[in-house]
């Protein structure tokens, strides 16, 4: 039930968890009512009837205002003078169908995993994302058994258009102890950190032995 967003696994690393808390306009009023009704009584009693306050919120806030709960809290405070602490919002009490569902699919459209949490999906599908990025890489991008800097400039970002999607990956120089390799990763920070270690290994491999 509710709304599902279909995400190709190769694009999972590019989807930011921003804006999905607002859901779609058709369900937003119901979501706002549910949020207000889920407040602890000491706060909820200030916003009765909840549907009326939801009506007012629908007219005065939008996704351009940032995070949904921040926008709702700020607007309700302006309307009533009541400050709602962040931890007063009981998201667990909101019906499941009022939370965005994320479905990650493979190249054949088969659902690999689905969850209401994007971060859980990213953590659980790291291996599948990595494999998918390797499959779309052009020949020569990923290399192994390198002992010299024979691959030119290593770009910070690799972009490829596939099936109408712009797939982004981040080349990293990986330390393999006796050599280095170039791998495409889904995380730019991880790629930078590992590349520093890979660069160190490559330098050590090219220092002449004192013996």
What do these predicted ranges mean?
Residues 1-211:
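A positional "C-terminalness" feature that preferentially activates on distal terminal regions of long
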């Amino acid at each position: 039930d509710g709304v599902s967003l279909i995400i190709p696994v190769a694009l999972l690393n590019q989807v930011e968890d921003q804006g999905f808390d607002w859901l779609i306009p058709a369900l937003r009023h119901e979501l706002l009512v549910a949020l207000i009704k889920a407040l602890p009584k000491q706060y909820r009693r200030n916003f009765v009837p909840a549907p009326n306050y939801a009506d007012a919120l629908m007219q005065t806030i939008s996704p351009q205002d940032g995070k949904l709960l921040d926008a709702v809290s700020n607007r309700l405070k302006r309307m009533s003078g009541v400050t709602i602490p962040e931890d007063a919002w009981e998201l667990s009490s909101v019906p499941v169908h009022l939370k965005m569902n994320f479905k990650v699919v493979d190249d054949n459209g088969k659902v690999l995993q689905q969850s209401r949490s994007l971060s859980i999906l990213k953590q659980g599908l790291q291996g599948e994302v990595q494999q998918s990025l390797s499959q779309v890489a052009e020949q020569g991008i990923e290399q192994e058994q390198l002992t010299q800097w024979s691959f030119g400039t290593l770009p910070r970002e690799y972009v490829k258009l596939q099936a109408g999607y712009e797939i982004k990956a981040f080349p990293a120089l990986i330390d393999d102890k006796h050599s280095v390799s170039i791998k495409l990763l889904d995380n730019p920070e991880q790629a930078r950190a590992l590349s520093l270690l890979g660069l160190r290994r490559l330098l050590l491999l090219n220092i002449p032995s004192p013996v």
